Amino acid sequence: MLTRHAITRRADADGVDAAIVERDYILAHVVAQLHRATPKDGGTLVFKGGTALRFIHIGDYRYSADLDFTVIGGDVEPAIAAFGDVLEAAKQHAALPYLELTNEDRPAISFIGPLGGAKPRHIKVDVATDEHVESIVRRTVLDIWPDLPDALPFAVYPAEEIGAEKLRCIIQRVQCRDLYDLFRLTEDVGVSLAEIRPLFERKARAMRIDPNSFPDRFEDRIERYKRRWNNEMGEHLADPPRFDNVVRIVRRHLRGAELLDS
């Protein structure tokens, strides 16, 4: 396990709270062991979401707060049981004083890490079985922390699947990170919204969501994104990009995909 000083030094360098960096350290060690997740019913635990962007797809990315998975070909309970094996391996490799899976109202990781403390902190874990998934890839964790184990591949959404779900999420909720993630996916990864639009539409319909509601929902959310931008994104980045610039660029990509009127 890295020292408390190593965590606070990186927090100072990145301009975020040390607790955010410690959580990232724990997440990285958990993700690095995902190859061990083998549900006994033959299902596949597939890593997804913004945390997958940070640890798999984009080296310089925002900090994340939780873990999201989809189970393909299996049920939630065996997948969560297999995830317990992942945590045990992460705990042993990193020599963490405490790392356990709790499953009361919903699954979560409880941990005590390099910063210490009398009480464990928590990371939310979401495991879905109702997602429409068309492709998965096998990737290894990026070398974000110096004491991670040897990288072995595991199942994860490709960037296009994540982008399509981010489009659907804009219809479903108001979270600034969805807008930020679309911004980075289009600008830095080269995801084409025009190419993933049919996938987004299929994902939306699979959840009984009308994809044609996207333009109105997007416009309805802009003011709320703006009010919350600095505070919400400040939990993930020291210096969030200017909101107006992000919206301008995302709008351009959405118009190119005919998801917004020209």
Describe the residue ranges of each PLM region:
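Structured mid-to-C-terminal alpha-helical surface segments
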Residues: 1-46, 55-67, 71-262
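Active-site glycine-centered loops adjacent to acidic/histidine catalytic or metal-binding residues
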Residues: 50
